[in-house]
Amino acid sequence: MGNKLFVLDLGEIRVDENFIIANSTFVTPQKPTVSSRLIDIPVSAYLIQCTDATVLYDTGCHPECMGTNGRWPAQSQLNAPYIGASECNLPERLRQLGLSPDDISTVVLSHLHNDHAGCVEYFGKSRLIAHEDEFATAVRYFATGDHSSPYIVKDIEAWLATPRNWDLVGRDERERELAPGVNLLNFGTGHASGMLGLAVRLEKQPGFLLVSDACYTATNYGPPARRAGVLHDTIGYDRTVSHIRQYAESRSLTVLFGHDREQFASLIKSTDGFYE
């Protein structure tokens, strides 16, 4: 039995396009009043069913992230609001597949921002894989009560309220096999302090390279590559995009970007089928 990959649609976030593609719009003496553009970008997770493991890549936003008593700070809700019906939250998407969080053996967290690690608290029985530098960054924001970043203090408080099986990837560990045909990749610093990807081999096609926000869209990917508007480390980001290209092309893998509207619309969603 080969691997199966399910694409989970977890709603959307509405953002200024400049967040995704740096300098998408800018004023000039000839055009002094150019307006920014709002776009809706997909929030996603990926479920890989293997012979002896069930691996989840990312967890989306917390179902209660928005509203007066929402997890997200008011400014985050204003700047980049989450949009999604109840069927788009992660526990519900798993239920639609006949699964619960307890059925997931391993959760790989590409990074710990609000739209990727919002549902960590549901996975009390799973191994949670995160980059050690990313974990340290998230905990620092929590410990200092800093609400100014995409690391959500209320989410992190819930993660740390009970013991969990954290597996932190060190800076020097470049790649690790999680299951036959499923490899964890350490992209290092770039969009965030520590980014992780997942290479998934399939039987009926070469497979996919899941890169999350290490590269937002095909426009960022290029060539020529274009930087995102939200970056922790520009040099690390450039290096990561180059590494992603080399890795994917040498293995004939299709890169699945973090927030590409056109690409995501073209994918088979978990409600309609899977890739194998």
Swiss-Prot record:
Transmembrane stretches, start-end: none
EC number(s) stated in the UniProt entry for this protein: 3.1.1.81
Cross-referenced InterPro entries: MBL_superfamily_lactonases (IPR051013), Metallo-B-lactamas (IPR001279), RibonucZ/Hydroxyglut_hydro (IPR036866)
Origin: domain of life: Bacteria
Claim: Hydrolase is one of the keywords in the record: yes
Annotated binding of Zn(2+) 1, by residue: H111, H113, H191, D213
Keyword flag Ribonucleoprotein: no
Catalytically driven reaction(s): an N-acyl-L-homoserine lactone + H2O = an N-acyl-L-homoserine + H(+)
Pfam families recorded: Lactamase_B
Cofactor binding note: Binds 2 Zn(2+) ions per subunit.
Official protein name in the record: N-acyl homoserine lactonase AiiB
Name of the gene: aiiB
